[in-house]
Design a protein with these regions (language model features):
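Active-site acidic Asp-centered loop
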Residues: 39, 84-86
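Glycine-rich, basic loop-to-helix element that forms the pyrophosphate-binding segment
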Residues: 60-76
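Short, acidic, metal-binding catalytic loop of nucleotide-sugar glycosyltransferases
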Residues: 23-32
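Short aromatic/hydrophobic "clamp" motif used to bind/position activated sugar donors
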Residues: 81
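Acidic donor-binding/catalytic loop of UDP-sugar-dependent glycosyltransferases
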Residues: 88-99
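Active-site regions of enzymes building and remodeling cell-envelope glycoconjugates
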Residues: 50-58
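A conserved acidic beta->alpha catalytic loop
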Residues: 37-45
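N-proximal low-complexity "stem/linker" segments adjacent to membrane-targeting elements
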Residues: 1-24
Length: 99
């Protein structure tokens, strides 16, 4: 499925900020599709994904910011893609203003 806008959240290990990031994306006034992308899969990331109904995309190979972010972009099936880092917080009108 091709979405108008996708947030691709890059998650690295067990960041204590990841849930706050996800909450800010789920609170958008105009909803966007959200995926979590990681090269460091963990039960912590899986639990948050399950809690918020999000898909987890796992990149094989060594972790590296360039390759991880390119992977996240490639996994997002959208006309517009926002790469969200695990400690980013987005204003609730971000998607509305973007679209």
């Amino acid at each position: 499925m091709r979405y108008k806008h996708v947030f691709a959240v890059c998650a690295y290990k067990d960041s204590p900020y990841l849930e706050q990031c996800i909450r800010s994306l789920k609170a958008q006034t105009v909803p966007s599709h959200i995926i979590i992308c990681t090269s460091t899969p963990s039960s912590y990331i899986d639990r948050l994904a399950w809690k918020y109904g999000l898909q987890v995309c796992v990149r094989q190979g060594e972790s590296g910011i360039k390759d991880d972010w390119n992977f996240a972009y490639s996994m997002a099936e959208g006309e517009l893609v926002t790469i969200a880092h695990q400690d980013d917080m987005y204003h609730r009108d971000y998607s509305a203003r973007l679209l």
